[in-house]
Amino acid sequence: MDHIRNFSIIAHIDHGKSTLADRIIQVCGGLADREMEAQVLDSMDIERERGITIKAQTAALSYRARDGKVYNLNLIDTPGHVDFSYEVSRSLSACEGALLVVDASQGVEAQTVANCYTAIELGVEVVPVLNKIDLPAANPENAIEEIEDVIGIDATDATRCSAKTGLGVEDVLESLIAKVPPPKGDPAAPLQALIIDSWFDNYVGVVMLVRIVNGTLRPKDKIKLMATGAQYPVEHIGVFTPKSRNLETLSAGQVGFIIAGIKELTAAKVGDTVTHATKAAVEPLPGFKEVKPQVFAGLYPVEANQYDALRESLEKLKLNDASLQYEPEVSQALGFGFRCGFLGLLHMEIVQERLEREFDMDLITTAPTVVYEVMMSDGAIIKVENPAKMPEPPRIEEIREPIVTVNLYMPQDYVGSVITLCEQKRGSQINMQYHGRQVQLTYEIPMAEIVLDFFDRLKSVSRGYASMDYEFKEYRAADVVKVDMLINGDKVDALSVIVHRSQSQYRGREVAAKMREIIPRQMYDVAIQATIGAHIIARENIKALRKNVLAKCYGGDISRKKKLLEKQKAGKKRMKQVGSVEIPQEAFLAILRVEDK
């Protein structure tokens, strides 16, 4: 076991994590040169395209070090984005070491810090690496200073490399072997294996990626998953080199896969412990928690007959993404669809994009909302994730909204505009620190404000230099109200939003004005109203189209004209009683684009 090293790579988006992984695999000869391709561990198209890693992947590599010994290196590739922070913490707890990759031209950024703190908390040895030193803009001294200043680990002897050209990659591996301790664990103890990730394979069912902490596993063993208590016979075990290779045993310290004919991905939860059914471990490995969605949105098919196809697509996506939750929902305006729960905004975008791209769905998405806690006047507490389900104001004692702690990092030139943005979003400043040219701001901001467009606006006010990560803090009582939109006195449920009272008037007026531009004129007057409970806060009218019924009257008696006008008026009135206003697709999207003032 002294020759095993389990490590992962942590970095901010675009600092070259996947490229470095490619180089390491190449140096260790994991794949022949002709099989090598860019971002070899990112298997989804969308991962390659956006340049982000979503699912964890592994590669078991052997490397002959300069001291002549052969080491087994297990590389566990982790996602870098905040939405997937739980997956990151599981991947890190399977390692003894982590390469902290920092772009020498950009320095430390938010997600680097967030994931690095997670690693330090889990007791993982962090090895700093400066990447992209071949760039003319690279400033390694500055980056080293930032690592020491912001994260507080010694980086004087940080290895310098360029993953793109392959320069210095062997030095990275040497310092990894020198600094990272070998895994501890007892091959003879009862089996304990941590599930790092799991996905669905069409041929063999669920594939579980595990790190064996104690014990030994062989094919035909009967295993038990501790969170659910379910038991399965093991069919295959092995490692990825990144290609899969079956083995006869997996023992303590190794990272590999288990295939046990599991049909449901929800059975193999990330972070759960696998043990033997007969000689079971006494307690599971620490750190397991059920992942709860933070952001909800309604997904509806554009064509009503696509509902079944959408359900199937969601089922297939759920096979590979256990954190996605959905339940059927009916909206009077949009018909049948699903209410989906996501880990965060990036997760939501990815799910939408995969539905559109891999399953050819045309979707309408309602405005994303967060989960509110509502205390009723009779003392009961309910959770509301859909504005349409919010109880009437008289029955509500108080509404509590989720507050998140946001860490922002940016060059000092942009501090002013970022602070202004946070103040607009009802944020309260907790902390502000200067690290050289970089500034770290900590704010508490209501999650609802972050969900809509905070990230985009942050990028635009800081010209793309600011980076952020956030974590849930608590529920706090807030003065929020539900704004409903009425069209000709009928409530349109899909347009309801929950906003802070201070913004409700403005929001109601803006949405009503947008609707007025978008809804086509009808044969009768259409009234668009925004209401809070029974109180109307904004109104817009769409004037009727009318035919000139007097065109054929030349001169003659006024009563003749009056009769025609009265007849037209009566017809319009009758029409208004039976007619329903078709709300075009754009109206629902318009709601998402109403800017806060």
UniProtKB/Swiss-Prot annotation:
Domain (tr-type G) ranges: 2-184
GO CC terms: plasma membrane
PROSITE patterns with a match to the protein in the record: G_TR_1, G_TR_2
Keywords: Cell inner membrane, Cell membrane, GTP-binding, Hydrolase, Membrane, Nucleotide-binding, Protein biosynthesis
GO molecular function, one term: ribosome binding
EC number: 3.6.5.n1
Subcellular localization, as worded in the UniProt entry: Cell inner membrane
Catalyzed reactions: GTP + H2O = GDP + phosphate + H(+)
Enzyme class per UniProt: hydrolase
Membrane protein topology class: Peripheral membrane protein
Positions that bind GTP: 14-19, 131-134
Keyword Cell inner membrane (UniProt): yes
Principal location listed in the UniProt entry: membrane
Database matches in InterPro entries: EF-4, EFG_III/V, EFG_V-like, EFTu-like_2, G_TR_CS, LepA_C_sf, LepA_CTD, LepA_IV
A biological process term (GO) from this entry: positive regulation of translation
One Pfam family of this chain: LepA_C
Role played: Required for accurate and efficient protein synthesis under certain stress conditions. May act as a fidelity factor of the translation reaction, by catalyzing a one-codon backward translocation of tRNAs on improperly translocated ribosomes. Back-translocation proceeds from a post-translocation (POST) complex to a pre-translocation (PRE) complex, thus giving elongation factor G a second chance to translocate the tRNAs correctly. Binds to ribosomes in a GTP-dependent manner.
Matching PANTHER family: TRANSLATION FACTOR GUF1 HOMOLOG, CHLOROPLASTIC, TRANSLATION FACTOR GUF1-RELATED
Family recorded in the similarity comment: Belongs to the TRAFAC class translation factor GTPase superfamily. Classic translation factor GTPase family. LepA subfamily.
The protein, known as: Elongation factor 4
Gene name, Swiss-Prot/TrEMBL: lepA
